[in-house]
Amino acid sequence: MLFQIDHTTASVTDFTVREVPFNVVAPFIEKWHYSHSAKGQSPKHCFALMHEGDMIGGMIYGFFAMRNQWKKYSVYGVDDEFEVIELRRLVCIDETPRNTESYFIGQTIKWLKKNTNYRIIVSYADPHHGHAGTIYKATNFYHVGMTSPGKIIDYNGQRYHDKCIRDINKAHLRKTGERIPAQSAVRLINALESGEAKMVETPGKHIYVMPLNKKSKKLIVESLVN
């Protein structure tokens, strides 16, 4: 569907933000996000940006992909994995007014402050895809560093984290105690060996954090000063 918004009259204040189920926002993310994927997001809170009955933006907040990743942010007052949430997917259609994304993020931050006990939001901007985090700077996130360079697997137009080739068959492990590769891992390994897939080195990602309480904000600011 092609959305037409009159830039001369439309304002971000004409838009509404709703919390929606994952299955409502996922098709929108798959259509409009550069990754064309909503899989593996560990979704916890999903939001839709609406205009005159049409969804014009989608956002997914979820828990970290790696279980102990939250510990990196304990220096900002995070005591367990349920006190930090990651902004994992954000996209709006092209035909939206300036500042639409920052308005969208701002409204969801207000919602999270009011309805949850998270201490910080974390998001990553990937230079490999031409992103430096401009939208996060515009919404007053703090840039706190870079992740280490990594590798991804490019296969059939999809990109997979290189850890996917180390996934194990959990059902087999529970049944026999034997560790064997998951079928998805075997498929990627075979594709790499045949040349159908390739391993691509990627630069580190920009790390942005948004404090949701005064204590975390103080700790973030102090860490940047020091």
Language model segments and positions:
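Class I (Rossmann-like) S-adenosyl-L-methionine-dependent methyltransferase catalytic domain
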Residues: L192, T202-P203
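C-terminal/domain-terminus segments
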Residues: N213-N226
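Acyl-donor binding region in acyl/amide transferases
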Residues: T16-E19, G62-S194
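Conserved beta-hairpin
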Residues: I29, P43-F63
